[in-house]
Amino acid sequence: MNYIGSKRTLLPFIDQCITSIAGEVARSGTFCDLFAGTGAVGRFYKLQGCSVTANDWQFYGFVLNQHYIGTCDPLPFLGLKDHIPMLTTTALPERGAVVCRFLEDLPPVEGFVSRHFCPGGTTNDAVQRIYFSDANGRRCDAIRRQIDAWLRARMITKGEFYFLLTTLLENMDSVANTASVYGAFLKKLKPSALRPLTMTPVECILSKRPQRVFQNDANQLIGRLQTDILYLDPPYNSRQYAANYHVLETIARNDSPALHGKTGMRNYADRRSAYCSRRHVRKAFADLIERANARYVFLSYNNEGLLTFDDIQQVMERRGRYGRFEQAYSRFQADRPSAERKIKATQTTEYIHYLVTK
């Protein structure tokens, strides 16, 4: 998934920083990713052998992490063997792909996504929304409806539900008619948005170690956690993730919310992050660090964030030994620079601030 702030390409730098301070703990200890997003960092440390705790406040993020972090064993899909006979002769590791192909072949139906996020469903509205093609919207509606029906009928487990929903979210994002975020859609369907939606199965990361996933406000959760390594990747600026990914949130929740404005925004008042507010961010960060129960704390932040270097250093060094690493990084651009919209710089500096607690 093309996600603002994703640390996928920065993983070598992040791991180098963490292992240089925490050593073998980063291969065998407990690791908490408190602002997990799509789970890229948590996935990496799960693969390294850590017991990972992942948390994200958005439901779509919770779903992704429930699968990538929370799922540790193969998914057998025993409850669907009568519904999909091919499962009876399919090896365990391949059963997820069989179920995904079944969903991919469902007849399209009209539903919430096709009626509210596609051009055909919004033709008579004040604004025609073009987040997805009509065909992909209807395919999404059919698949999402079937996944919920199986869960209600107890034909799939929660783990199987998260696998299928994660697969749908990842594949829908790959055919979205956006410039990476859902705060706006493009005026015409781009080539990738015209591709038919597929259900290419997402990877399953197996593990024998316990893994945990939460959906909480980070500052409310921190007092309940104890970990060797606490990794923090909060929002850097005023853009709320609840607004930037509202369409994925609606697909994940499948709750048919009231929508507002040109972009079809759902109400996200209860998901506003203090880390996106210049007025509240320092207080929230100080509270988080003060109550963190961890041997090592690592903070990813860049030079364009709302917190200043002084803010970060003053807060972190109260709890122990502070330091930081840095690396140049290509900044996120949702669209190309133009005469009307000029990008300040093509690169930012990414920092890893660290704290070894007393």
What is the predicted role of each segment?
Residues T308-K358:
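C-terminal catalytic and target-recognition region of SAM-dependent MTase-like enzymes
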Residues F31-Y45, A54-G61, N171, R224-N244, ...:
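Conserved proline-anchored active-site loop of SAM-dependent methyltransferases
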Residues L75-I84, D233, R341-Y354:
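A polyampholytic, Gly/Pro-enriched intrinsically disordered region
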Residues M1-L34, A40-Q48, F62-L64, T71, ...:
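S-adenosyl-L-methionine
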Residues A274-G323, Q327:
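Conserved Class I SAM-dependent methyltransferase catalytic core
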Residues S51, Q58, F62-I205, S238, ...:
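Class I S-adenosyl-L-methionine-dependent methyltransferase module
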Residues Q215-Q220:
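Conserved SAM/SAH-binding loop
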